[in-house]
Amino acid sequence: MALNLEDKKAVVAEVTAQVAKASTIVVAEYRGITVGDLTKLRAQARQQGVYLRVLKNTLARRAVEGTPFAELAEQMTGPLIYGISEDAVAPAKVLNDFAKGNDKLVLRAGSYEGKVLDAAGVKALASIPSREELLSKLLFVMQAPVSGFARALAALAEKKQSEEGAAA
């Protein structure tokens, strides 16, 4: 379906707004994917807070102009789906996990912190634990000494009570 000029401007404005608050963009080729599979991918992306969109490459290039992602424009050729997110790892993880189960989705490139990543770089980014996973690990590490100390105090109190009970 051809877009008129106003529709194109609206799409570019919407994508530009997403890019402005993004920390990562991942680009994948979707040639040959069924509508059902694409719908599943969109649902997974939505759950992870990833903006996922199939765009005309010229519109995507206009949306990234003047942003830290401008260098990614060189990689925008062919039928591509764009994953954009504030979370640095989420778009790479969503698209990489889906590509493992569907060989028709091919990771092409990405951009993170102003650097263009190749497919291997996107896969490496996808292997990093998410922010929530890292925070839960940090919380566990911080709680371990406190809970150990609390268990030691409880054991000491129990020992004192048993000694007092035996002495009486």
UniProtKB/Swiss-Prot annotation:
Question: GO molecular function of the protein, one example?
Answer: large ribosomal subunit rRNA binding
What are the record's GO terms for cellular component? Answer: large ribosomal subunit
Keyword rRNA-binding present in the record's keywords: the answer is yes
Ranges in coiled-coil conformation: none
GO terms for biological process, alphabetical = translation
Pfam families in the cross-refs: Ribosomal_L10 (PF00466)
- rRNA-binding keyword on record: yes
Q: How does it assemble?
A: Part of the ribosomal stalk of the 50S ribosomal subunit. The N-terminus interacts with L11 and the large rRNA to form the base of the stalk. The C-terminus forms an elongated spine to which L12 dimers bind in a sequential fashion forming a multimeric L10(L12)X complex.
Q: What is this protein called?
A: Large ribosomal subunit protein uL10
